[in-house]
Amino acid sequence: MLWAAALYAGPLDDTLATGRKALSNDGVATAWRLAQQALTDAPESAAAHEFAGEVRFRRGEFAEADAEFKAAVEWNPRFAPAWWGLGRVAECASMNKTAVEDFRRAYQLNPNDPRILAAWISRLRGPERAEALDRYAHASGDPKVLQELRQRAELARALNGREAMALVSPYKAAEVPLRPFVSGATRMRTFGLEVVVNGKPARLVLDTGAAGIVLTHPAAERVGLARVTDATVRGIGDNAKPTGGYRAIAGRLQIGDVEYRDAVISVADRSLVGIEDGLIGSNVLGEFLITLDFAGGKMRLDPLPDYRPGEEFADRTVSPQMESATRVFRFGHLLLVPARVGNARNRLLVLDTGAASTLISTELAAAVGKVNRDDKTALRGMNGKVGDVYQTGNLVLEFAGFEQKNLGMTAFDTWQLSHRLGTEISGFLGLPVLDLFTLTIDYRDGLVKFERRR
């Protein structure tokens, strides 16, 4: 019987190894085929179910991924990658407390797995974090992930125990003017905030697709920021080398009547066109319920129910105010909205008020109709110009109960972002469509309410 089990395990191990290699190289279709083969060959294998969960997660099918990870745990409760997978699903679904518990269980079972270690390091502090970083380096972890984790560690040392982005004004409702900006260089229309950094004014484009605050070099010098650690500023674009820069700490950041101490700010080395003095991601204000009233020219900030600033977020709850909201999935600063384009299966599009148009991936565009090369449309992001741009025929876009007919949509390759996040990004909901709504964003609970203007 042991001999039979060994024969059984050999082909399965080969299938999983080939599948994992395909998945790491973004061969999702091949990985999906091999995952199905593994489940057929070994339906009682925790490893087969766990790998199927990974492929489902990469496809953006989180409920199905969760089911596969749970099946893996049922067959083998000590299979660490399955707990890591459950943590990933819980985290993107705003089940914040559950995610920490799942990642902790995975780490306890296998503290040297690079993927598990990377997920757990961000939750450590002080000497524990330094020791874990050293182990991550020796575990042959992803160099890019290691670089980011080390930069965060350097930033933590510079803060010397102080909390970054500490709210010092009262945690109460506030209203901030939401200004329409028009770029003189690109004529692109955006909305932004007039903020005060270290006592000096700055105009920042409000971008739901951006991470934190990014300033241009001239603006950073004007407000007196000094380099604390190197930083990589990521975004769309085809430059082989990501935009470099540095992180700094501003003593004071004022956004209307809301004030923060020790605000972490990224400064981009590369010239940034059409973004005023910089960008501010709406996630900066994630401790509030954020309402973006584009037509009324204002941003409202309300306290989250049952929350005090500085507390760890609990598992998602839905307040009466947000009962009609759309459930979204959070990956760091990005909010992914379930959407449907044409007759394709449901996909995930980034909520992106900083995008000048709604964009879709070339993969999705090819799945729903004819695609033609478009050499007239110029796309540019934080990482430079996008080289290959395409145009579709007429398509219908559906999300949050809303339907819009489009006389063609712009498409480009989103594989870099999808690879970095570990799930399929099929496009961006840009400002022209988002401007039709008043948006209420709840980062804690992964909810966005789309209220159509009449």
Give short role names for the model-derived ranges.
Residues A4-A9:
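Boundary at the C-terminal end of the N-terminal hydrophobic targeting segment
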Residues D13-S24, A29-Q37, A47-F51, V55-R454:
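Pepsin/retropepsin-fold aspartyl endopeptidases
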Residues P43:
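Acidic/polar, glycine-enriched structural segments that form the non-catalytic walls/loops
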